[in-house]
Amino acid sequence: MIRIPFHLRQTPGRTLHSLVRSFASTKPADLSGTQEKSTRQKINFHELKHPSKVPQRPHKSTIDGQSTPTRIPVDAQKGQLLERLSLVDLDSAEAHRTLEDAIEFASQILSVDTDDVEPLYTVLERERLTLREDRVSDGNIQQDVLRNARVTEEENFVAPPENIPLEQEPRK
């Protein structure tokens, strides 16, 4: 990755030609990012034309801490069922803890009141998005698509052979 020093970054109104010219006139030491801290310019984020869309303060949770459910244990039989359905290995104690944490988090989300909240079309609903125009075609690209598959059978994709089989012996 090439890091461009701040003083060489393109500013509004600066052409590519002038940027290349100033880039070519710099010393290799300037491009390595080994400048002293005293010569670096500090960025004032409040003066940027497009400041970050990431909130500066965390969102206060509406989840009541007292109404959160206790830890929901996952027994061995449910663990095996989830392993088989999700094709994820849950052998370790850490995997079981992660699964229980995920279930606890999901149950907290269920307690959030969303009655008067209007659904979003997208997270960036207020942003102007340029979408491509839909073009209807008859397709006929089946062979092109199937070339991407590692294994095919009768003009269909085949799931990876490393998957966990559906029938399993119960663990001891």
From Swiss-Prot:
Q: Where is this region: Disordered?
A: 51-73
Annotated organelle transit peptide span: 1-23
Q: Which reaction does it catalyse?
A: L-glutamyl-tRNA(Gln) + L-glutamine + ATP + H2O = L-glutaminyl-tRNA(Gln) + L-glutamate + ADP + phosphate + H(+)
- Using the chain's own numbering, where are the disulfide bonds? none
What is the annotated localization of this protein? Mitochondrion
The similarity comment for this entry is:
Belongs to the GatC family.
Its assembly, as annotated, is: Subunit of the heterotrimeric GatCAB amidotransferase (AdT) complex, composed of A, B and C subunits.
HAMAP family according to UniProt? GatC
Provide the function of this protein: Allows the formation of correctly charged Gln-tRNA(Gln) through the transamidation of misacylated Glu-tRNA(Gln) in the mitochondria. The reaction takes place in the presence of glutamine and ATP through an activated gamma-phospho-Glu-tRNA(Gln).
> Which PANTHER family does the entry link to?
GLUTAMYL-TRNA(GLN) AMIDOTRANSFERASE SUBUNIT C, MITOCHONDRIAL
The entry's protein name is: Glutamyl-tRNA(Gln) amidotransferase subunit C-4, mitochondrial
What is the organism field in this record?
Culex quinquefasciatus
